[in-house]
Amino acid sequence: NHQTYFADVVAMFHVFNASLSGRGNSIKNVTYLWNPKLNIYYVAAKETMHAGLLPKIMAYAGAITVERTWRSCGKDVTEKREVNPDDTENIRIALDDGWVITFPQGTTKSFKPVRKGTAHIIKQYRPIVVPIVIDGFRRSFDKKGLRMKKKGIKQSFVIKKPLEIDYDNDTIEEIVEKVEFAIEQHPSFLKVVPAEEIEN
């Protein structure tokens, strides 16, 4: 899941394009941006993308804005809103055209539940799902990802193998659990390993 609002997405564009141009573990010398992959889209909360000049500019760079049903103005809402069908249709159009980045927990906080809407989209549109584990951005940047808090911290993306999903038979709950394990955000990852087990 993302750790800042913007730094993660910008870094992903660099990593994907560097990798597509044959780079291995390096985004130095950004000549790969002369011919970038442009059909990369990302799902973002509509309220976030309207909250300032930079978000509005970034919205033109491939944002699929959606109305969150469980959160508004930075607070959880008690009465969940209905899903806007236009939002899921826009995601379908983007999937037909290229790659879609989504952060399935819908927040920058770690170990929050994966939203079932992500699983519904996976089950309905049957995309190839490639999990990515993000690390280091929360410690390096502020929440928005615009100001560096601490230097010398390694930021990383671990791109894993595509998930094995039975689109016909897997339940929404099973897909949610697969995603949680794949991005290392399942509650079991929070368990503290006793010192004696580490020593053995």
Predicted regions: what is each one?
Residues T118, I175-H186:
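Short amphipathic C-terminal alpha-helix that caps PH/PH-like domains
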Residues V9, T88, R115-A119:
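Conserved glycosyltransferase catalytic-site signature
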Residues N1-T78:
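Catalytic core of membrane glycerolipid acyltransferases/transacylases, capturing the structured
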Residues Y5, K37-K56, I91-L95, W99-T102, ...:
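A short, hydrophobic secondary-structure junction motif
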Residues V193-N200:
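Short, highly charged C-terminal tails/helix-capping segments
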Residues T88, R92, S156, I172-E180:
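Short, amphipathic alpha-helical "lid/cap" segments that border enzyme active or binding sites
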Residues D96-I101, G106-E174:
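A cross-family acyltransferase "interaction/gating" segment
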Residues I64-F111:
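Internal catalytic-core helix/loop-beta-alpha segment
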